Amino acid sequence: MTDQADATMPIKFTDAAAAKVKGLLEEEQNPALKLRVYVTGGGCSGFQYGFTFDEKVNEGDFTVEKQGVQLVVDPMSLQYLVGGEVDYTSGLEGSRFFVKNPNATTTCGCGASFSV
């Protein structure tokens, strides 16, 4: 995928996140798995992000492919994530996937929940 094509996507999937997903899928020996990101009610700011691995792509789901792996977002969650970026970090505070969300007006201290 080119940078130009990447710029037109409603949600981006960073190289770091794609590389981590690829490594995890190799460990699981299941290339059919995809990283699903979703938004649910809850957390200290109203909404929270969730991540899970899923073999299915449901009707209406939006997918982004990078480095041979897929990120999947359901239509309800996508409306809160448009313009966002799924990334991965590893540091002293642990390792995790996270969302850089330009739609979030407030976030909690750990970045796991947000409001719009």
UniProtKB/Swiss-Prot annotation:
Cofactor binding annotation: Binds 1 iron-sulfur cluster per subunit.
Keyword Acyltransferase included in the entry's annotation: no
Keyword line: Iron, Iron-sulfur, Metal-binding
Residues annotated to bind iron-sulfur cluster: C44, C108, C110
Gene3D superfamilies documented for this protein: HesB-like domain
Keyword presence, Transferase: no
Molecular-function annotations in GO: 2 iron, 2 sulfur cluster binding; 4 iron, 4 sulfur cluster binding; iron ion binding
One annotated GO biological process: iron-sulfur cluster assembly
CC annotations in GO: cytosol
The protein's required cofactors: iron-sulfur cluster
SUPFAM superfamilies: HesB-like domain
Complex and partners: Homodimer.
Role played: Required for insertion of 4Fe-4S clusters for at least IspG.
Family stated for the protein in its record: Belongs to the HesB/IscA family.
Record protein name field: Iron-sulfur cluster insertion protein ErpA
UniProt source species: Shewanella oneidensis (strain ATCC 700550 / JCM 31522 / CIP 106686 / LMG 19005 / NCIMB 14063 / MR-1)
